[in-house]
């Protein structure tokens, strides 16, 4: 396996092979960033098709050529965080090498590939794989690439940036992949997200669906081919971070959130009641609420516990104005990403409602909170479980990577004693699916969703929603799945 680190053309004259180690010996190379995007390309690739998709704030390291799965991680040794994207046959390669890599993995996304690359039900059918191998020549390679791209125009665009590896080398790679797949044990690596092209003619979409039943937390679908430059660019060089999208959409919903967020208000009241039941009766000196939003839960905390100091935090600076009626010498507001901010040490309670599901690295946040809390401190929060908005996920393939109550408590148990956990399912009824979409938009919970609607897609969505999720005549349902957890610092 080859690894190369790529730099923007204006800053470097070359890319580095893994043999150069962690230092930069090429004149004009920029300093290494703290984080890297590790991209496992598909069969027959090199770095050429992807050099124009450099991420804006991470180093890009590309893996390709799977004649061997020897994985030299020298280039990755200095990074504090690694984000993995794998495409096509690279998904299998990544699934094999990542479990034993000890890399600081932050996120993993698989695009149009599976951990089972040669499989009648979960990958490329063996007969097709063997046919591709046995008949491979320059002409059949171009036919394969045409099928990979899905259209003549996409194929012509790909030819301008196509890899230049010889056909014999590509044949050797296919032979090696087949041999290694038959010899190596199946990987148990679990991906954060799998993205499936519904017009993929290389890895059949149904096979991808079957393969990912136990090996990913979230499935996203799009209407496109196996090689889709737009999808690859979105994941290699995203235009806006998910946190920025979250902030933008909640900011737009400030005016309508208090009226529409009925479930979130119900959850806030229950969370406050649970705190009253399970926390000591004495008054709290220092409390931090992250993700305070428009202040629904904040006001309940103030009335119920009267803390000496309450620090409100939210990703959206604009939420300060929604909370201005309660801001004073005891209640302050700190804008920013709670995962990155430093909260005051010696805090007695760190709490939130309906926020943690948006976090990229909740386990790291739990560790940070344990360091911030005083010796008798508590972390208490509500979040959402795997059944949350299951209707939207089933119909669009989009949604957050929700964690179960068991997964959350297992993560917390290393540092905290679990005081109380519970979960419930809340079903809201609406007159029609359009009201569901309006409700989601008005509460801002579309968050990181990038669904684009055409008239035909919207009509199909509404028809399927009414067919599948109509509990009674004239209404449709939307599921919320809140989880409540209170834990004490050990």
UniProtKB/Swiss-Prot annotation:
Gene3D superfamilies: Vaccinia Virus protein VP39
Name of one Pfam family that matches: Methyltransf_11
Location of the region described as Malonyl-CoA O-methyltransferase in the Swiss-Prot/TrEMBL record: 249-490
Region annotation (Unknown) ranges: 1-248
Catalytic activity from the UniProt record: malonyl-[ACP] + S-adenosyl-L-methionine = malonyl-[ACP] methyl ester + S-adenosyl-L-homocysteine
Enzyme Commission number, as recorded: 2.1.1.197
Biological function: Converts the free carboxyl group of a malonyl-thioester to its methyl ester by transfer of a methyl group from S-adenosyl-L-methionine (SAM). It allows to synthesize pimeloyl-ACP via the fatty acid synthetic pathway.
Protein name (database record): Malonyl-[acyl-carrier protein] O-methyltransferase
Gene this chain is encoded by: bioC
């Amino acid at each position: 396996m080859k690894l190369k680190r790529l730099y923007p053309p204006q800053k470097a004259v070359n890319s580095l092979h893994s043999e150069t180690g962690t230092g930069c010996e090429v004149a004009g190379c920029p300093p290494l960033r703290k984080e890297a995007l590790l991209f496992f390309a598909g069969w027959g690739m090199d770095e050429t098709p992807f050099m124009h998709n450099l991420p804006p704030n991470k180093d890009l390291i590309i893996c390709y050529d799977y004649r061997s799965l020897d994985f030299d991680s020298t280039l990755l040794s200095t990074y504090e965080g690694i984000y993995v994207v794998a495409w096509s046959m690279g998904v299998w390669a990544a699934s094999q090498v990542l479990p034993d890599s000890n890399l600081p993995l932050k996120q993993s996304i698989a695009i149009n590939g599976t951990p089972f690359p040669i499989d009648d039900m979960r990958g490329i059918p063996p007969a097709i794989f063997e046919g591709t191998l046995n008949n491979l020549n320059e002409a059949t390679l171009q036919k394969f690439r045409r099928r990979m791209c899905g259209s003549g125009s996409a194929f012509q665009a790909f030819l301008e940036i196509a890899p230049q590896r010889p056909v014999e080398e590509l044949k050797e790679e296919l032979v090696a992949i087949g041999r290694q797949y038959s010899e190596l044990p199946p990987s148990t690596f679990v991906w954060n997200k799998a993205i499936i092209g519904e017009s993929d003619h290389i890895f059949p979409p149904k096979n991808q669906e079957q393969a990912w039943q136990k090996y990913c937390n979230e499935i996203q679908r799009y209407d496109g081919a196996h090689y889709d430059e737009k999808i690859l660019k979105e994941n290699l060089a995203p235009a806006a971070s998910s946190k920025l999208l979250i902030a933008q959409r909640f900011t737009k919903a400030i005016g309508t959130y208090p009226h529409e967020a009925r479930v979130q208000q119900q959850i806030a009241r229950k969370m406050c009641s649970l705190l009253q039941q399970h926390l000591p009766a004495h008054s709290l000196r220092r409390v931090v609420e992250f993700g305070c939003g428009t202040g629904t839960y904040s006001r309940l905390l103030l009335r119920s516990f009267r803390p000496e100091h309450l620090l409100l935090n939210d990703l959206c600076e604009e939420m300060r104005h929604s909370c201005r009626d309660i801001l004073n010498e005891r209640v302050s507001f700190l804008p920013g990403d709670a995962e990155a901010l430093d909260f005051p040490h010696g805090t007695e309670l760190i709490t939130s409602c309906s926020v943690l599901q948006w976090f990229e690295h909740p386990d790291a946040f739990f560790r940070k909170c344990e360091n911030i809390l005083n010796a008798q401190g508590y972390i208490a929060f509500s979040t959402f479980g795997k059944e949350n908005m299951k209707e939207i996920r089933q119909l669009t393939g989009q949604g957050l990577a929700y964690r179960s109550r068991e997964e959350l408590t297992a993560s917390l148990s290393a540092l905290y004693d679990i005081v109380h956990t519970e979960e419930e399912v809340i079903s809201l009824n609406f007159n029609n699916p359009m009201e569901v979409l309006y409700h989601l938009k008005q509460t801002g919970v579309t968050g990181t969703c990038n669904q684009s609607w055409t008239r035909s897609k919207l009509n199909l969505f509404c028809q399927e929603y009414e067919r599948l999720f109509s509990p009674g005549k004239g209404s449709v349902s939307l599921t919320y799945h809140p989880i409540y957890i209170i834990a004490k610092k050990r």
